[in-house]
A protein has these predicted regions:
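Active-site-proximal segments of catalytic enzyme domains
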Residues: 100-103
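Conserved short beta-strand edge segments in small beta-sheet-based binding/regulatory domains
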Residues: 122-138
């Protein structure tokens, strides 16, 4: 059984929210369950290893070497979405290069993975590649149903094709305060009708 030490958690590409990490690590098994970790990633132009080794590849290439698929599989986690950012439609900063979402079987599994030797063997590549990242623990919301008269792909002016496929829009929202969450539900309902 791997016992992570949240107080030792430190990375060069962001600030670990130790309070949140502690909550994840100590969630009672009866209250724990799947969690989706959304990763917003911004890369260094050139990989920068902490041990001083010279790297002749980009931060993105270093992150590709990190890709912890083995440790994820070992704990029962699975990547469910991975995409390079084509265009950042709103706000220029921070600039995100890639978005990834991983479904973990539990909060505890996410925290305990950080201490696994097979994960730690790869992590220096992430440290070298990332300029900045945000990792947010998320739980899916129930999507509003599509209206009965929603058009099919065949009925829209520019349907997706093999040469010009559909676009996935990732909309990350930061609330000013918790009292505004009801407004977000209203926005989501209206956006679903328009989309």
């Amino acid at each position: 059984d791997v016992k992570p030490d949240i107080n030792k958690a430190k990375v060069r590409y962001g600030t670990v929210n130790k309070e949140y990490g502690f909550r994840l690590a100590t969630t009672a098994p009866a209250d724990d369950g799947p969690i989706w970790m959304v990763n917003l990633m911004s890369y260094r132009a050139k990989a920068d290893y902490a041990d001083g080794r010279e790297a002749e590849y980009s931060g993105k290439e270093a992150d590709d070497r990190y890709a912890p698929l083995g440790p994820l599989k070992a704990i029962g986690a699975q990547p469910v979405f991975l995409a390079d950012v084509d265009t950042q439609f709103l706000n220029d900063t921070p600039k995100w290069d890639r978005v990834g979402i991983v479904k973990y079987p539990s909060r505890r599994a996410f925290i305990e993975m950080q201490s696994r030797p097979d994960f730690q063997e790869l992590h220096h590549h992430k440290e070298a590649g990332m300029a900045e990242t945000i990792v947010a623990g998320c739980l899916p919301m129930e999507l509003p149903p599509l209206p009965a008269d929603a058009p099919s792909w065949a009925d829209v002016p520019h349907p997706p094709t093999a040469a010009d496929p559909y676009v996935v829009v990732v909309h990350v929202i930061k609330f000013k305060d918790d009292d505004r969450r009801d407004e977000m539900a209203t926005y989501t309902d209206h956006a679903a009708k328009i989309a």
